[in-house]
């Protein structure tokens, strides 16, 4: 979670934790890591994912548009970095980074009017972690049921044709 714009990100964090607990997570299994700002989120997410200790990573932050191009650069890099980390590590990453034009929009998305994006990110993280586990189990079961290559089209099959 990014500390920058903490008034917003702390609300996102509380709702994300609430969502995880409601879905059956144990408090002791929820790790919270704080980073200075949104730009640091992808690096921290990748570092955590590479440990192999986490089923999913929930990335929380808040970016507010200012009067310069800085916002656009940071939004693009954070988004790209989170997606890249998820693809490279194979660990699901939920995107809970608000990208808002105004503080009012951020407040709304942090729970006052439009739901809470932290809670939504927690739901997405659990759904994707569950999907990964299901696919992994199905894959390991189907590998056990496969016919050995030699019996399908290898040496044994060629000998019988001659």
Tell me the role of every PLM-derived stretch:
Residues 8, 40-82:
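Glycine-rich phosphate-binding loop
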Residues 101-115:
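Phosphate-binding/catalytic loops
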Residues 33-51, 97, 102-103:
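Glycine-rich oxoanion-binding loops at beta->alpha junctions
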Residues 32-37, 73-75, 113:
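Active-site nucleophile and cofactor-binding loops and adjacent substrate-binding regions
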Residues 115-137:
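A charged, well-structured terminal subsegment
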Residues 72-99:
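Short, acidic/small-residue loops that bind anionic groups at enzyme active sites
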Residues 133-162:
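Intrinsic disorder/low-complexity segments
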Residues 1-36:
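Glycine-rich phosphate/diphosphate-binding loop of Rossmann-like nucleotide-binding domains
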């Amino acid at each position: 979670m990014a500390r920058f714009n903490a008034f917003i990100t702390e609300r996102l964090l509380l709702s994300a934790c609430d969502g995880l607990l409601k879905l059956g997570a144990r408090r002791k299994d929820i790790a919270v890591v704080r980073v200075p700002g949104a730009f640091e989120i992808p690096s921290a997410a990748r570092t955590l994912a590479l440990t192999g200790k986490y089923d999913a990573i929930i990335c929380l932050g808040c970016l507010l548009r200012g009067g310069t191009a800085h916002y656009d650069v940071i939004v693009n890099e954070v988004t790209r970095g989170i997606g890249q980390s998820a693809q490279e590590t194979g660990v699901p990453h939920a995107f809970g980074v608000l990208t808002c034009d105004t503080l009012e929009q951020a407040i709304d998305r942090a729970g006052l009017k439009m739901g809470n994006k932290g809670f939504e990110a927690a739901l997405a993280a659990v759904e994707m972690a569950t999907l990964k586990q299901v696919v992994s189990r199905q894959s390991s079961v189907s590998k056990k049921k496969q016919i050995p290559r030699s019996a399908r089209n290898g040496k044994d099959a060629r000998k019988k044709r001659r």
